[in-house]
Amino acid sequence: MHTQPQSYQAPEQTHMRIENRRIEAGKGGTNLLLIIESRVDTLSINLPTLYSLLFTTNITILMSAPQHRQLRRAAHITKIASIDLCSLEEEDHEDLVLEESGHHPSDIQNEKPNRPPYSTLIRKRSGKVFRFVRPKLADLWHSRYHEASFDLGRRLGIGRRTQSCCEDVCDEEVSVETMAITALPMDVWLKERLKKWVQLSGHEGSIVPATPHTLYKKQCANCGEGRAYKNISKDPALDGFTPKYYDELEKNEEHFIEIEDLLQQFHDPTKTAIMDIKIGTRTFLESEVSNTKKRADLYEKMVAIDNDEPTEEERKCGAITKLRYMQFRERESSTAQLGFRIEAAKRLEGALEKNFKKVRTVEDVTTTFMDFFGTQRSRVRQQLIERLKSMRKAIEHSSFFNSHEVVGSSILIVFDTEKVGCWMIDFAKSSPVPNGRTLNHRTTWIPGNNEDGYLIGIDNLVKILEELPEYGEHPDDQLMVTEEVIARMKNTKS
């Protein structure tokens, strides 16, 4: 039985599809990625001709149908990733069966390199298995075999070598232009990226690198984030203000979406300052607080945070509703007052910081921003103001925001010494407004009106940035320079 893979256009890659029991590739079916895993350390690919080789982020191999037949008969080749199968017109191609196999991205965090990557298996009924990975590169990066050494233009005698490994490949020894690949059982690229990987917020391991330019984000049960991103991608007003959305997948009963890694827009993502700001006066869905049952566990949590908070009636009852607890938590931060709160940040020359629970007032936020922007304050501040004003205008004209409550979303701020970026991220709690009503995102929330205060948060964010002093106007600025120099020296020594 043939399985139709989901139509998917990967970033800067080639689109694959199944059509009439024949595997084809878009864009002429020529430029695909070839990686071989061999049972031996060094594998000489027995291809009669190597037409083209381009080594940038991938390798381009052009092959003809006879070459496919020869390669597929090589018993010592156990896995083929993203090979050009557009010319697979052999008499036995109906014997090919596509099967799904793989593991989920969280395995990468746990360093389980022996698990097979996400892929589609091409399994012959004879039992031989060839692995075909759709060309979105994610599977390759999740494999231990993404690294290979190349010996170009080397003339190799392949007859005797392959004769011992497979049947009916070559009748006599011949010399051909080919390529020797040494499969290195290591994940250098992935380890290097994970070593530099910074996840500001969310559960650890819920977001992992997928490709050099995309991320896998794990989805909770009944999460509509993929649907939200699809709707956003259809809204021209929001173009460029959110990560690009590529795919939604399910593995082992777990759901993931693949989105753009915004940090890859910067020259060196490891040398960027990053801040996650939760936007809105409400960070919970109405459905989450619809239950009016009073709970003792929530009362205990409230008392642990602030023993003076409970009312006399609540103390007698020893229990509170979820709505009461959530509103209390939001008053503890700047969410209720300003319509946003700082979740996490990493300074340009500093470590990740997540302890912003005491940042509540305008003065607290101002001090935090000054520390975060450092000596880049004047430049970053001005560019952020312009970007946020453009974002605000886009939201006001957005069909998506007009018809959706957007709860728990964040503004992601990223900058380095040359560039400043600002985007909206996290749409897991976005949902359509019932009964065709529209939202303005500035009206005060009352149960039932679905208003989220998104624009209240952006309005206040812009206002605070506009009132932020230029660099050099504050007494602490000279101290800031000294701290940055010390931090830079420490990083250089390490």
From Swiss-Prot:
The protein's Enzyme Commission number: 2.7.1.127
The cross-references to Gene3D superfamilies, in alphabetical order and at most eight, read: Inositol polyphosphate kinase
Task: Give the residues the record marks as binding substrate.
Answer: 278, 322-329, 429
Tissue-specific expression = Expressed in spermatheca.
Activity regulation summary: Unlike mammalian IP3K, may not be regulated by calmodulin.
Query: What UniProt keywords apply to this chain's record, in alphabetical order?
Result: ATP-binding, Kinase, Nucleotide-binding, Transferase
Q: One GO cellular component term, please give it.
A: cytoplasm
Q: Which reaction does it catalyse?
A: 1D-myo-inositol 1,4,5-trisphosphate + ATP = 1D-myo-inositol 1,3,4,5-tetrakisphosphate + ADP + H(+)
**Could you say which residues bind ATP here?**
206, 218, 260-262, 276, 346, 426
What exactly does this protein do? Probably by regulating inositol 1,4,5-trisphosphate levels, negatively regulates posterior body wall muscle contractions required for defecation and let-23 signaling pathway that controls spermathecal dilation and ovulation. May also regulate ovulation downstream of actin cross-linker fln-1.
As for family, the record states: Belongs to the inositol phosphokinase (IPK) family.
Protein name as it appears in the record: Inositol-trisphosphate 3-kinase homolog
